[in-house]
C-alpha cells in the first residue's frame, strides 16, 4: 500500500506519497524534501519528528524509549507509514529537552 505523508516543517507543509515498505525519510529525500538526519539507523535523535495523525511502524529503531513513542515521537529514518500520516519534523530539541 502507498500512503499520503504530510510533513509539517519549519518552511511549511509538504505532502508526498510513501509506500508502506519505504522509510519516510528516504521517500521524502527522493522527492526533493530536505530533512535533518545523522545516523540513518534509528540510533540517534537527529531526524526526530512527532506524529500528530496516523500511525507508523518504527520497530527498526532502538533510540526512543516507550514513553517517547507513546508521546508520538518518531525517527523518520526508520519509520514506515501504516496509514496516511502527519508528522511535525525538526523535533530533536523537544525530544531531548
From Swiss-Prot:
It is found in: Plastid, Chloroplast. One of its GO terms (cellular component) is chloroplast. Belongs to the 2Fe2S plant-type ferredoxin family. Ferredoxins are iron-sulfur proteins that transfer electrons in a wide variety of metabolic reactions. Keywords: 2Fe-2S, Chloroplast, Electron transport, Iron, Iron-sulfur, Metal-binding, Plastid, Transport. Residues 3-93 form the 2Fe-2S ferredoxin-type domain. GO terms for biological process: electron transport chain; ferredoxin metabolic process. Gene3D superfamilies: 3.10.20.30. Pfam families: Fer2 (PF00111). Its cofactor is [2Fe-2S] cluster. The keyword Transmembrane does not apply. This is Ferredoxin. GO terms for molecular function: 2 iron, 2 sulfur cluster binding; electron transfer activity; ferrous iron binding. [2Fe-2S] cluster binds at residues 39, 44, 47, 77. Its main location: plastid. Signal peptide: none annotated. It comes from the Eukaryota. The keyword Iron-sulfur applies. Transmembrane segments: none annotated. InterPro entries: 2Fe-2S_ferredoxin-like_sf (IPR036010), 2Fe-2S_ferredoxin-type (IPR001041), 2Fe2S_fd_BS (IPR006058), Beta-grasp_dom_sf (IPR012675), Fd_pln (IPR010241). It comes from Alkekengi officinarum var. franchetii. Binds 1 [2Fe-2S] cluster.
Amino acid at each position: 500500500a502507498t500512503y499520503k505523508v504530510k510533513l509539517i516543517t519549519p518552511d511549511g507543509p509538504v505532502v508526498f506519497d510513501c509506500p508502506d515498505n519505504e522509510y519516510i525519510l528516504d521517500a521524502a529525500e527522493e522527492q526533493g524534501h530536505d530533512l535533518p538526519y545523522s545516523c540513518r539507523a534509528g540510533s540517534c535523535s537527529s531526524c526526530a519528528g512527532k506524529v500528530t495523525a496516523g500511525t507508523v511502524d518504527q520497530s527498526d529503531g532502538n533510540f526512543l524509549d516507550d514513553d517517547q513513542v507513546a508521546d508520538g515521537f518518531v525517527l523518520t529514518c526508520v519509520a514506515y507509514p501504516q496509514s496516511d500520516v502527519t508528522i511535525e519534523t525538526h523535533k530533536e530539541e523537544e525530544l531531548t529537552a
